[in-house]
Design a protein with these regions (language model features):
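Mid-to-C-terminal catalytic subdomains of enzymes
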Residues: 121, 128-146, 155-240
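A conserved beta-strand->alpha-helix junction
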Residues: 37, 46-96, 123-130, 183
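RNA-binding accessory domains that recognize and position tRNA/RNA substrates
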Residues: 1-8, 26-27, 170, 212
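Soluble or luminal CAZymes and related metallo-dependent hydrolases
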Residues: 100-108, 201-202
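ATP-dependent adenylation/pyrophosphate-handling site
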Residues: 6-59
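Short, glycine/charged-enriched secondary-structure capping and boundary segments
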Residues: 24-25, 52-54, 79-81, 135-139
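Active-site nucleotide-sugar/metal-binding loop of Leloir-type enzymes
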Residues: 112-117
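Short glycine-rich phosphate-binding loop at a beta-alpha junction
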Residues: 6-11, 120-124, 210
């Protein structure tokens, strides 16, 4: 974020976003949290609001919590669908309209971006794919693991991240995903997949790196639900 005077981090209180916030505050431009905004969304009483509050306290940073309503969730989902339809209308090659889990995730990202008070925004997209954070990776080994990893990364880079960028553009946000930096992705390609889940722990390598960089242990080892579950969005859209 060279040249940025202020930036928001989409902050759920989990490992991925906590590490971004921790590293950002070490940069001279954002020393001690100056110019940083931690943007959190969730329905009233949701796990993400509580976890973000405790993580921000552990980091010594302030955060902005946006308590969303079921009506706002449904409206955001319609906006996501409209953004994708508009691409089709303009002759762009895009996937079918998002449904199910994909719609829930994109809806959560749209709501989080709406709540980010700055134009420049960082998010933790890519960490679960690159560091094997998803539960579906757990039983996989060898070629099956390699195949699923390649499928997930291809889906993210070719479909989900471009869709997220379209949402950000519609909201006039400059959204960056540090975990998807090409140099980092290339560097990680030299690490065997099994080494990324040290001891069989999802994102084990990332947890070790985070701890070595000074992230509080409670955050480096924290497990949390995915955005759509921790925020309560799944419970709303699954009934829609």
């Amino acid at each position: 974020m060279a040249g940025a005077s202020s930036v928001s981090v989409l902050f759920s209180g989990g490992l991925d976003s906590a590490l971004l916030a921790h590293l950002l505050r070490k940069l001279p431009a954002f020393e001690g949290g100056r110019g940083m905004e931690l943007a959190t969304i969730g329905l009233a009483g949701s796990a993400d609001l509580a976890q973000a509050a405790s993580a921000a306290e552990a980091l010594g940073l302030k955060f902005n919590a946006r308590t969303i309503t079921p009506e706002q969730v449904r409206a955001a989902a319609r906006s996501v669908e409209e953004t994708e339809r508009s691409q089709t209308a303009h002759g762009q090659l895009v996937p079918p309209p998002p449904q199910g889990m994909r719609l829930e995730v994109l809806t959560g990202l749209r709501l989080a971006l709406e709540g980010a008070p700055t134009t420049r925004v960082l998010c933790g997209q890519g960490a679960d794919e690159l560091f094997l954070g998803y539960a579906h990776f757990l039983p996989l080994r060898g070629e099956r693991l390699e195949r699923r990893y390649r499928e997930d990364l291809s889906q993210l880079q070719g479909t989900d991240w471009p869709a997220t960028q379209r949402i950000a553009a519609a909201l006039a946000k400059d959204l960056r995903a540090p975990y998807l930096d090409p140099e980092l992705v290339q560097k990680l390609s030299t690490f065997p997949l099994e080494s990324r889940r040290r001891g069989g722990v999802p994102k084990g390598l990332l947890r070790e790196v985070a701890a070595s960089l000074g992230l509080p242990t409670e955050l480096a080892q924290r497990r949390k639900k995915a955005l759509q579950y921790g925020s309560g969005i799944h419970s709303v859209l699954s009934r829609a």
